[in-house]
Every structure is written in C-alpha cells, then in structure tokens.
C-alpha cells in the first residue's frame, strides 16, 4: 500500500486527507477531484510521506468517535451540522454553521483527548439563516381540552 487517500465532501466542498509518496501524486489527485462535476472547492491536506499504519488510522477513528460524542453532549450545538474527519491527530471539521456554533464546536473539539490540532472548514451562515433551516417546533397539545358534545 503506497497511497492512502480519504475523500470527504460537505456541501460541495471536498477535503482530501491521507498520504501519498510524491508531490506529483498529490497534484494528480487534486487535479482529478477539481474536475468533478459539482465540486465547488478542494481543500488539499494530503501529506507527502509514507502511508500511516493501520493502528494509527484506528486511533484516528477513535478520536473522531470521541469528538462526535462530545459534540452530541454539548447542549448548544446540533451535532448533525458537523462533519468530522481525524487524520494523524488533526481534526478537520466541516459544516454550515453560525460563527457562534463554529467557535463553540472548536472549543469542544480542542478539549478532546488525542486532538493535536483543529482545522476549521466551515461555511459561516447568519443566525437568521440558521433559524430558517430549523423547522419550527410542533404546537403544544392541549391536554385539558375535551371534545364538545
């Protein structure tokens, strides 16, 4: 195994992580992804280095799981708004979120054991845009109301 490439997409932004043997391989992969239909932008985080071990990748998966659990536990964040990838102890975080959510999520992730660095790849939206994305809560049921005879 000479190449290890992860392709993660969120809202037409593509994140490339992993390891390739040469700069030429790195540029070839980026060029291929940039030509794909509906790709708005490519974030190239491919490292020119030997491929990481299976145990290193497994450790990254554990860290990603811890991050997701921490986002779920956070009361002021909607965990599904974030896509998280961990590669070599660097957490890459994608999402369409408000500045408040981006800052809060970054603080949560920085405190997760095993995270050495956080790379923010957010599309920042306004609080008003967020309100428009979230469906209104259903009206409360009137338990005391009885059908009229």
Predicted regions mapped to residue ranges:
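N-terminal targeting leaders
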Residues: 1-149
């Amino acid at each position: 195994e000479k190449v290890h490439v992860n392709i993660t997409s969120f809202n037409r932004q593509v994140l490339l992580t992993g390891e390739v043997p040469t700069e030429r391989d790195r540029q070839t992969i980026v060029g291929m992804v940039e030509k794909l239909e509906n790709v708005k932008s490519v974030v190239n985080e491919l490292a020119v280095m030997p491929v990481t071990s299976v145990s290193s990748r497994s450790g990254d998966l554990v860290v990603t799981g811890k991050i997701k659990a921490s986002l779920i536990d956070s009361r002021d964040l909607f965990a599904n708004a974030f896509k998280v990838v961990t590669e070599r102890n660097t957490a890459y975080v994608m999402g369409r979120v408000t500045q408040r959510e981006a800052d809060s999520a970054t603080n949560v992730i920085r405190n997760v054991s095993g995270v050495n660095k956080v790379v923010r790849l957010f599309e920042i939206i306004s609080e008003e845009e967020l309100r428009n994305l979230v469906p209104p809560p259903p009206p409360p049921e009137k338990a005391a109301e009885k059908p009229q005879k």
